[in-house]
């Protein structure tokens, strides 16, 4: 049976329900799992009946996946990837996917579906291991956007492939890793920087609960990196500490120029983080404007 703890997400209610109902699986977006793991009363609840579940809805941080497996007893947790327009899952790991693949990829393409990873400019399929736009085709792809033929033609090509706008790689075994969004990619001084990579690195900081990285306009480099950071309960962070953590571990141009410590991120009602709002709010706060280009 399926148990709904509440009509809206609340981390404490979820923990209480898992213990009371002896749930074996738990589904949610990454921000929900993070809130549960870092709740002050987390250790008081018995989650030993948990075994599996699904993390999906937005990029799943590797460090969070590891914590879910180790601290929530979800040894068989999986990741699903897709979008509303693809009904929604195109790729998913399984309970028997090797551990290293299960925490770091979205698994393999689902049965009876096709995917390809292409160069967004040329449309050509990229080699294994190279980054490109993930496209998917099959019975799950929508017929189109209601009353919007132009937008439908932009999203679905003549061969029936849905262009997701997500940047991805595929390894030699067919496992897919989502690198980021094409629109989220930051071009700083001619260097392509993927916010997801910076986020994954910062999740390793022992005092960081959650982090989101975006690009903001810059007169000199075109764009600069900005990180919004939520500290773990009871922890205090400052810019100097975060920069020291980054020093010598990632390339200098990948260290965010702007750091902002917040209590929450702007989110949709379904728990997805609104990066565009973070970008807009920072531009307003810093008095930055987009540069006109040829």
Where are these regions (language model features)?
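Acidic/polar alpha-helix N-cap and adjacent early helical turns
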Residues: 280-294
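Active-site glycine-centered loops adjacent to acidic/histidine catalytic or metal-binding residues
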Residues: 57, 82, 107, 138, ...
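Glycine-centered tight turns that cap/initiate beta-strands
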Residues: 41, 49, 73, 112, ...
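Gly/Ser/Thr-rich phosphate-binding loop
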Residues: 15, 20-28, 37-101, 114
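A short helix-loop-beta submotif of the ANL/AMP-binding
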Residues: 1-3, 24
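Adenylate-forming AMP-binding core of the ANL superfamily, especially NRPS adenylation
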Residues: 59, 99-147, 155
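AMP-binding/adenylate-forming catalytic core of the ANL superfamily
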Residues: 18, 26-29, 133, 138, ...
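Beta-strand->loop->alpha-helix junctions that form or flank phosphate-binding loops
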Residues: 77-85, 105-109, 214-216, 260
């Amino acid at each position: 049976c399926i148990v709904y703890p509440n009509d809206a997400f609340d981390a404490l209610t979820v923990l209480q329900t898992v213990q009371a109902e002896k749930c074996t699986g738990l589904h949610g977006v990454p921000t929900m799992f993070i809130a549960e793991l870092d709740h002050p009363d987390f250790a008081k609840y018995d989650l030993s009946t948990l075994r599996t579940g699904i993390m999906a809805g937005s990029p799943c941080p590797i460090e969070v996946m590891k914590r879910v497996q180790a601290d929530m007893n979800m040894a068989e947790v999986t990741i699903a990837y897709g979008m509303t327009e693809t009904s929604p899952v195109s790729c998913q790991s399984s309970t028997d996917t090797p551990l290293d693949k299960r925490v770091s990829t979205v698994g393999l393409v689902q049965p009876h579906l096709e995917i390809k990873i292409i160069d967004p400019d040329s449309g050509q399929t990229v080699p294994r291991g190279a980054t490109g736009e993930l496209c998917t085709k099959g019975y799950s792809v929508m017929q189109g956007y209601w009353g919007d033929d132009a937008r439908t033609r932009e999203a679905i090509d003549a061969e029936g492939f849905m262009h997701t706008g997500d940047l991805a790689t595929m390894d030699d075994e067919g496992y897919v890793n989502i690198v980021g969004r094409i629109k989220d990619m930051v071009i700083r001084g001619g260097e392509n920087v993927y916010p997801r990579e910076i986020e994954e690195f910062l999740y390793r900081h022992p005092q960081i609960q959650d982090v989101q990285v975006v690009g903001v306009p810059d007169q000199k480099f075109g764009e600069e990196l900005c990180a919004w950071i939520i500290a773990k309960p009871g922890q205090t962070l400052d810019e100097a500490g975060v920069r020291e953590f980054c020093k010598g571990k990632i390339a200098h141009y990948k260290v965010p120029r702007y750091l902002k410590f917040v209590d929450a991120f702007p989110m949709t009602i379904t728990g997805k983080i609104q990066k565009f709002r973070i970008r807009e709010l920072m531009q307003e706060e810093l008095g930055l404007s987009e540069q006109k280009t040829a």
